[in-house]
Amino acid sequence: MELYNMGSLRRIAVPSSIAKELLGRCREWSRGERPPAKVRMGGLVFGLQCIDERAVLVSESGSRFVVDEHAASLGERSMAVVGSTGFMGVAEAYRGSYYKLVPLPGGKPPTLEINGIHMHRVAGTDPWSDALAKASLVVKRGFRVLDTCTGLGYTSIAAIARGASLVYTVEVDEIVLQLAALNPWSHRLRDKRIRIILGDAVEVVRDFGDSAFDALIHDPPRFSKSTSSLYTLELYREFHRILRRGGRLFHYTGEPGRIRGLNLPGRVARLLREAGFEVLGFRRRALGLVAVKM
């Protein structure tokens, strides 16, 4: 299998609200009020310089990212892509579907929207807290982990934060990875302990050996006709094969159709049992099932 390279950090996506804050600090600086010299965004720490009424973020490797009024003028739901020369566009893409990085209030990690639909839980939580909740259910120090749906990489990063020694993560959509490469909160995807595979998880899992992983996090998009291949008995049997005995699986299901009496978690639980898992139950904090290979 071929690993995906996130590339070096040449451009970053900055929430418009943070751009405004940075320019405000520079105005204070011009009045002789020295602002803090360090700025943290996600997994990145920058030095702050103020040059010609622009904020210049300097990474630890020396790369420079120029934030100007154009970046600050975007709406609150937009992130500006900036590089060494300044504003380069909005953190969005269109290729059959519309993709956009959307910042959240309070400096929380941004979410990804595809055709206006959040790819993360944001009601009553935030993407990072949700990723930690999922990882904490199955990941322990030293574990080898498979994360089947990379997205912006928060779950893989959370697994490393929990002490995983190695994480393989699979993403089917290269545009999603391109946006993750811009996102400062996704920067730790470049950690040498995380290995990214561009491909269909249904096919990629067949390439792993028996008992290859200690834990598996399956966080698919909501169930639909186009994502149904991520909810099949065939795939769950592959999960059972590649997990070691005693290894745990977290499977996000959400609660779609609960009001209408539909029960996706129950259906998934039945298929997991048929695949050989013991289902330990539904974990409301993470809105998914935990199962173990006995």
Each language-model region and where it sits:
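Conserved beta-strand signature within the Rossmann-like core of class I S-adenosyl-L-methionine
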Residues: G246-T253
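N-terminal auxiliary segments of SAM/dcSAM-dependent transferases
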Residues: M1-P105
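A short glycine-rich, Lys/Arg-flanked "PGG" loop and its adjoining helix->strand segment in the class I
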Residues: Y231-R245
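Conserved SAM-binding motif I beta-strand of class I
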Residues: L166-E171
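Conserved SAM-binding loop of SAM-dependent methyltransferases across substrates and taxa
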Residues: L152-A164
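Class I S-adenosyl-L-methionine
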Residues: G257-M294
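S-adenosyl-L-methionine
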Residues: V172-D210
